[in-house]
Swiss-Prot record:
Keywords: Cell inner membrane, Cell membrane, Membrane, NAD, Quinone, Translocase, Transmembrane, Transmembrane helix, Transport, Ubiquinone
Molecular functions (GO terms): NADH dehydrogenase (ubiquinone) activity; NADH:ubiquinone reductase (non-electrogenic) activity; quinone binding
EC id: 7.1.1.-
GO biological process, one term: ATP synthesis coupled electron transport
The gene coding this protein: nuoN
Organism whose genome encodes this protein: Shigella flexneri
PANTHER family the record matches: NADH DEHYDROGENASE
Protein name: NADH-quinone oxidoreductase subunit N
Length: 485
């Protein structure tokens, strides 16, 4: 197949990020300069974001059988790039106090972003697997980047071993699907899986093993055991990337697979997914109740958020509203998580020991950093799904989709899970306004709001509030991504 100029325009974000990887590599080889390499990375990611406008002008098209570039791909590429940009921004002040090599951090984030973009455009099980590996392998290094701290190294080893096991399940599942269907393209799978073929034992086993592999990457129950330990052990900026870009890219490609190949038409697969969604919502929220570590708490809460999203995925066959619900929910989850992890990143630095992730570190934050405490409060309220925040809009969409698809027991789980979540999110918010301890442990820099990371946190808070009151611009963008499927 010949690559045309139009194809190259469609692949601009992928090409720009790939070129940035090469430039940063050469820059590191030439001269180690933290500021220079951080700047090059941020310029590359911003250029990739801007290039999405040109991709939109080119229109939807298939670029080789492995990738399809359309509105859906553009939406998820944009979300991945925003998350990667925020990660680099939060990492800069964190790395300033890091005594070992700093520059490779940006290289690993860029390679992981490349994997996320590939997943957003994936239209084939081969590109799905390649994208997942491209996003996972750099994360092994990123999670253990603060390797002189025992927790970080332990988290990296745990994530590496379990991720390798999950990848083998995913690959074996794909092999079984190929053995039965004779094709790996999403569109071809949709054509080949008609007439009750989905009930074939080999196909059910294949998709079952793929659910195990993807369930691990999305940290769904019962494949979630790595999540709290890795979130706690990883540096705060890396936890940001794990919670946002990684989850968004993988969930986006799963959505496309379910849309083209009627996987959800199988009653057995629907039941399994419904049980996983129910368990993720209830278990994730219950386990978060007892946490005194903010990163562990956010890790468990991310399990429940992916459970809410699964409700919309199960209802995908009932109408386009499910796609809209997932797009809006993921945007809300992205900005809320960026704000929450951004505050943790601003409060942390490697030369002061482990991250400021204990709930006690945030007690009375309002009395000496009022704006930072207000931002953290907004993020907690949004993650809890309180009205007037973007998190509420996303949760309302998920409930509406569940009701439309008559998934009553899952709707009940969402309501109960949200009620439980309200308790532990408010516990974090309330602790910010208690009397500060006589000897406060950690603190953000006095000029935090003028740093790039501080600006990202403030913009995230502003978007969560503005789009929570007036969500129409976001809904319009998400709807633009749908007709091009």
């Amino acid at each position: 197949m010949t690559i045309t100029p139009q194809n190259l325009i469609a692949l601009l974000p992928l090409l720009i990020v790939g070129l940035t990887v090469v430039v940063v590599m050469l820059s590191i080889a030439w001269r180690r300069n933290h500021f220079l390499n951080a700047t090059l990375s941020v310029i590359g990611l911003n250029a990739a974001l801007v290039s999405l406008w040109f991709v939109g002008q080119a229109g939807a098209m298939d670029v080789t059988p492995l990738m399809r570039v359309d509105g859906f791909a553009m939406l998820y590429t944009g979300l991945v790039l925003l998350a990667s940009l925020a990660t680099c921004t939060f990492a800069y002040p964190w790395l300033e106090g890091y005594n070992d090599n700093k520059d490779e951090f940006y290289l690993l984030v860029l390679i992981a972003a490349l994997g996320g973009i590939l997943l957003a455009n994936a239209n084939h099980l081969a590109s799905l697997f390649l994208g997942i590996e491209l996003i996972s392998l750099p994360l092994f290094g990123l999670v253990g980047y603060a390797f002189r701290q025992k927790r970080s190294l332990e988290a990296s080893i745990k994530y590496t071993i379990l991720s390798a096991a999950a990848s083998s399940f995913l690959l074996f599942g794909m092999a079984l699907v190929y053995a039965q269907s004779g094709d790996l393209s999403f569109v071809a799978l949709g054509k080949n899986l008609g007439d009750g073929m989905l009930n074939e034992p080999l196909l059910l086993a294949g998709f079952g093993m793929m659910i195990v592999g993807l369930g691990f990457k999305l940290s769904l129950v019962p494949f979630h055991l790595w999540t709290p330990d890795v979130y706690q052990g990883a540096p705060a900026p890396v936890s940001t990337f794990l919670a946002t870009a990684s989850k968004i890219a993988i969930f986006g490609v799963v959505m496309r697979l379910f849309l083209y190949a009627p996987v959800g038409d199988s009653e057995a697969i629907r039941v399994v997914l419904a049980i996983i969604a129910f368990a993720s919502i209830i278990f994730g929220n219950l386990m978060a109740l007892s946490q005194t570590n903010i990163k562990r708490l956010l890790g468990y809460s991310s399990i429940s958020h992916l459970g809410y999203l699964l409700v919309a995925l199960i209802a995908l066959q009932t109408g386009e509203m499910s796609m809209e619900a997932v797009g809006v929910y993921l945007a809300g989850y992205l900005f809320s998580s960026l704000g929450a992890f951004g505050v943790v990143s601003l409060m942390s630095s490697p030369y002061r020991g482990p991250d400021a992730d204990s709930l006690f570190s945030y007690r009375g934050l309002f009395w000496h950093r009022p704006i930072l405490a207000a931002v953290m409060t907004v993020m907690m309220l949004s993650l809890a799904g309180i009205p007037m925040t973007l998190g509420f809009i996303g949760k309302f969409y998920v409930l509406a989709v569940g009701v439309q698809a008559h998934l009553w027991w899952l709707v009940g789980a969402v309501v109960v899970g949200s009620a439980i979540g309200l308790y532990y999110y408010l516990r974090v918010a309330v602790s910010l306004y208690l009397h500060a301890p006589e000897q406060p442990g950690r603190d953000a820099p006095s000029n935090w709001q003028y740093s790039a990371g501080g600006i990202v946190v403030l913009i995230s808070a502003l978007l969560v509030l503005v789009l929570g009151v007036w969500p129409q611009p976001l809904i319009s963008i998400v709807r633009l991504a749908m007709p091009l499927m």
